[in-house]
Amino acid sequence: MRILLVSQMYPGPDDPDLGVFVAQVERALAARGHDIERAVLDRRAGGKRRYAHLARRTFATARRFRPDVVHAHFLVPSGLIAALAARAPLVVTAHGRDVRNVGAVPAVAAATRLVVRRAAAVVTVSDYLRRELETKIPEARGKTHTVDSGVDLDRFRELPAPDGPPRFLHVGSLTPRKNVLRLARAFERLGEGTLTFVGDGPLRSQLEGRPGIVLTGPVRHDEIPHLLANAHVVCQPSLIEPFGQALLEAMATGRSVVATTIGGPPEFVPPEAGVLVDPADEEGLVEALRAAARLPRPNPAARAAAARHDVNEQARRLEAILERAARGRRA
């Protein structure tokens, strides 16, 4: 197939970690023999003007490339741009924030409804997100499919675990939604080991100087396996997590996890691979940390659970949806 990829997030020289999950799926599709052209934004800078640039690039590439199908990541703005720019059948993948924004901004809801009506198929990265989208945009019912971003099992290999007291790791932004302050308090109440936060955000100052807590700041995505090699348990007790890519990557290396019950993680974290916890329950989070620290190191069950989400298998499932759309049938 000739596939036009449209995305407002894609790795580039200035932002090599921007939309790595988009590039990961694209590589897996290309490895299956498809001809892929991109109309993408590969940097965060530029404000809203960059979306005009994406629109121009999408129109030009669609005219030149004449794709069999268009695959857009994010409902708005990428999906909207793709819906307006290309005549080929459209498949759009929703990742989370694009669905949350539907209820926050009326114009976004209207644009999303247009995209969903235009699309031959809508892919969501979790069943949780699919249900949310179908509730907000009933027109999505009957054309939604759940295919997550998967994990590269060659890049995230099973790793031996270090000895010693429990080493907890959090990978993500230091924001209220990620629930990092409650995680820090629960760790302090646990009273053993270390907790490393990888990332940055507005709550950094409230985490600095706490005993046993380490702040690395932002790191490149290709450095994450090294950090996982020095951890026992990866924690993501977010208030909501549409999917949970960091958890899946951690599990692929054999790391047990502590994950939120709200969102996508319950769909891929079985009891033997980690502990699910109500993100508002601080006492429960303390016990979740304690229980996860007692799981095997490394944890073969975590690796096995992650292997069911191999990016190559996810690409095969996405390929089937794209092919049906390209043939002009509802995918």
Q: Which stretches of residues belong to each language-model region?
A:
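Conserved acidic donor-binding segment of nucleotide-sugar-dependent glycosyltransferases
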Residues: 271, 275-282, 291-296
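A charged, aromatic-enriched C-terminal amphipathic alpha-helix characteristic of glycosyltransferases
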Residues: 17, 296-323
